[in-house]
């Protein structure tokens, strides 16, 4: 009988600030636990964090710190994939293809767009739509 493939999980966390207890309880702790049952791909979503203005040096530092934190809580890069979003060109290329095939009306109804627009009314940019 053929070996059954494990289901795959893709998830990411933005390096927008100091990780909180909420980040740990709500996501990161579960990521470590899910590794035994799933094929996991976890990303530090640095490109997603660009929808809010960032100081480049701070973003690079927080990206490294977040990757180190994920390793420290038990994400196993020998068994699963841990990557920085901006280091994978195919991610940006696919984003462009999807953006060119998604209607503006669909994007404007997204809850993340509405939430971020309300929180940062002085910085509503095109990146929020993707």
PLM region spans:
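N-terminal Rossmann-like or analogous alpha/beta NTP/dinucleotide-binding catalytic cores
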Residues: 2-130
């Amino acid at each position: 009988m053929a070996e059954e493939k494990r289901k795959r999980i893709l998830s990411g966390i933005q390096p927008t600030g100091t990780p909180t207890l909420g980040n740990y309880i709500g996501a990161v702790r579960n990521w470590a636990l899910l590794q035994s049952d799933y094929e996991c791909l976890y990303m530090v979503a640095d490109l997603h964090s660009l929808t809010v203005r960032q100081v480049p040096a701070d973003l690079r530092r927080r990206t490294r710190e977040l990757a180190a934190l994920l390793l420290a809580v038990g994400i196993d890069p020998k068994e699963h994939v841990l990557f920085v979003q901006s280091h994978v060109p195919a991610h940006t290329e696919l984003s462009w293809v999807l953006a060119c095939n998604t209607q503006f009306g669909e994007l404007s109804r997204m809850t993340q767009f509405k939430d971020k627009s309300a929180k940062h009314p002085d910085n509503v940019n095109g990146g929020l739509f993707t």
